[in-house]
Swiss-Prot record:
Protein function: Involved in the transduction of mitogenic signals from the cell membrane to the nucleus. May also regulate the TOR signaling cascade. Phosphorylates PFKFB2.
Organism annotation: Sus scrofa (Pig)
Annotated protein name in UniProt: Serine/threonine-protein kinase A-Raf
Biased composition (Low complexity): 254-267
Residues recorded with modification Phosphothreonine: T181, T318
Family named by the database record: Belongs to the protein kinase superfamily. TKL Ser/Thr protein kinase family. RAF subfamily.
Gene label: ARAF
GO annotations of cellular component type: cytoplasm; cytosol; mitochondrion
Domain RBD, chain residue ranges per copy: 19-91
């Protein structure tokens, strides 16, 4: 019979204290409990565990007898253990540990992990790395969570589902864009019925990995997506409004007015002008109009390159959005001929408006935009990158990078994406294929923007379909429930998958061979990259940043300013071996230190 675990009933005499027991608790803590008659080990240690955020279900208790640990049941009476020592340890399969908070002043740029606001004075856990304000302390979990251990059990259940789901019917009668809610692993294992969890039938061919050094083919065919180009259109409209004002002359004539002279002739001037003065004013107005029109053409017209000036040399690769060629135009360039067959007037105007935004991008981690072509089809000219893509280095050439180099690649990628987002440019197709290592380890991000090309059009209206590669797609992009699912957070999710490639050296979901199954499970929240495969020497802060970037809810993902600040702080904290300033060369011989005159004199001595 289980002993009582609550206080004594009314009228009962309180248990009498007969001694003490010394208890060693997790995280190098210890306490002394009083031994009372009629109480068990469970009751005696209940308060000591609760104040430390633990409970008996996640712990095991040992008796320390002659230096050896012996497992003891929780319902053992405490009275016979008077004067002995007990040891309480957390179960190995329960990834829980206590926080180790310290007060900290963040002199470098840092953000609170809960309110995501700027953090200067606050607290930090030395174990899991949580940073927070004092008023955000109520949101901190009571225990530290090791995400790599916590997800391991979940992935075993997912693999069981993926292995045993081939006999289920395909969800052809169940559209993917119905309301989706993420389910926990328990719900996945309980509902094996096809009506509750219908898996798509796996394809015969596994996922293909395109091994091209340039922009290769993506994993979805004919799945270009709409893009809300509101930001681009607002910029273009304001630009066109200013240009229209310039073409109207300096007197503020409307766009539809025939000429500045006709407007000026309609005004009543207080002084009559002679015909010669009127002709002089008209000629001055015409000269101003010509100068301003030429200025407008300089800002946008000369970015369009005539096709006769560009020479295509070699085909590099083909993707879902176009074909990349190596070409010559005042030097080596990369020319991407876009797949837009018979563009409409709306598409042509939207493409030119977007080029007006892309031409203003200048950053060390962004491929330099050099121009565009509209005849005979849409094409973009960028700088030529001699290096290979990050995909080629990691998955084809198997290039070995040390952890410092991997973190630096992650920092440069975050720096380039932070610049694009500051320009209100959403990448929409960020992946390791579009990240190039130029002249060593300098990161160059390419194939950004291009909302006009990455949208399927039906006449003048865009179609709502996802674009990009399956492995790098966020759940909200796969579901396409929102009118515009692409956001800064969807780029953050794709960046999280790139981090996963850097820290594991492999692609996610390599154990699943069906693309449709990946789309279905990721869109519903049943599947995410397995963090237990991360390298053991990966810093704890990088592991936690990777987990945050891959959150199912996009509101919970950090933005690139916070990501960049976290990686820069991590880089500064890494140990470095620096050369001594007083000894520039460690391999200098003793003879090198002697003056030349002494050496010549030594040779003359017989």
């Amino acid at each position: 019979m289980e002993p009582p675990r609550g206080p004594p009933a009314n009228g009962a005499e309180p248990s009498r204290a007969v001694g003490t027991v010394k208890v060693y608790l997790p995280n190098k803590q210890r306490t002394v409990v009083t031994v009372r008659d009629g109480m068990s080990v469970y009751d005696s240690l209940d308060k000591a565990l609760k104040v430390r955020g633990l409970n008996q279900d996640c712990c095991v208790v040992y008796r320390l007898i002659k230096g050896r640990k012996t497992v003891t049941a929780w319902d053992t009476a405490i009275a016979p253990l008077d004067g002995e020592e007990l040891i309480v340890e957390v179960l190995e399969d329960v990834p829980l540990t206590m926080h180790n908070f310290v007060r900290k002043t963040f002199f470098s740029l840092a953000f609170c992990d809960f309110c995501l606001k700027f953090l200067f004075h606050g607290f930090r856990c030395q174990t899991c790395g949580y940073k927070f304000h004092q008023h955000c302390s109520s949101k901190v979990p009571t225990v530290c969570v090791d995400m790599s251990t916590n997800r391991r059990q979940f992935y075993h259940s997912v693999q069981d589902l993926s292995g045993g789901s081939r006999q289920h019917e395909t969800p052809s009668n169940r559209p993917l864009n119905e309301p989706l809610t993420p389910q926990g692993p328990s719900s996945c294992t309980q509902h094996r019925d096809p009506e509750h969890f219908p898996f798509p039938a796996p394809a015969n061919a596994p996922l293909q990995r395109i091994r091209s050094t340039s922009t290769p083919n993506v994993h979805m065919v004919s799945t270009t997506a709409p893009m809300d180009s509101g930001l681009v259109q607002l910029t273009a409209q304001s630009f066109n409004t200013d240009a229209a004002g310039n073409r109207g002359g300096g007197d503020g004539a409307p766009r539809g007015s025939p000429s500045p002279a006709s407007v000026s002739s309609g005004r009543k001037s207080p002084h009559s002008k002679s015909p010669s003065e009127q002709r002089e004013r008209k000629s001055l107005a015409d000269d101003k109009k010509k100068v301003k029109n030429l200025g407008y053409r300089d800002s946008g017209y000369y970015w369009e390159v005539p096709p006769s000036e560009v020479q295509l040399l070699k085909r590099i690769g083909t993707g879902s959005f176009g074909t990349v060629f190596r070409g010559r135009w005042h030097g080596d360039v990369a020319v991407k001929v876009l797949k837009v067959a018979q563009p409409t007037a709306e598409q042509a105007q939207a493409f030119k408006n977007e080029m007006q935004v892309l031409r203003k991008t200048r950053h060390v981690n962004i491929l330099l935009f050099m121009g565009f072509m509209t005849r005979p089809g849409f094409a973009i000219i960028t700088q030529w990158c001699e290096g290979s893509s990050l995909y080629h280095h990691l998955h084809v050439a198997d290039t070995r990078f040390d952890m410092v180099q991997l973190i630096d690649v992650a920092r440069q990628t975050a720096q380039g994406m932070d610049y694009l987002h500051a320009k209100n440019i959403i990448h929409r197709d960020l992946k390791s294929n579009n990240i190039f290592l130029h002249e060593g380890l300098t990161v160059k991000i390419g194939d950004f923007g291009l909302a006009t090309v990455k949208t399927r059009w039906s006449g003048a209206q865009p179609l709502e379909q996802p674009s990009g590669s399956v492995l790098w797609m966020a759940a909200e992009v796969i579901r396409m429930q929102d009118p515009n699912p692409y956001s800064f957070q969807s780029d953050v999710y794709a960046y999280g998958v790139v981090l996963y490639e850097l820290m594991t050296g492999s692609l996610p979901y390599s154990h699943i061979g069906s693309r449709d199954q990946i789309i279905f499970m990721v869109g519903r929240g049943y599947l995410s990259p397995d963090l237990s495969k991360i390298s053991s020497n990966c810093p704890k802060a990088m592991r936690r940043l990777l987990s945050d970037c891959l959150k199912f809810q996009r509101e919970e993902r950090p933005l690139f300013p916070q990501i960049l600040a976290t990686i820069e702080l991590l880089q500064r904290s890494l140990p470095k071996i620096e050369r001594s300033a007083s000894e520039p060369s460690l391999h200098r011989t003793q003879a090198d230190e002697l003056p030349a005159c002494l050496l010549s004199a030594a040779r003359l001595v017989p």
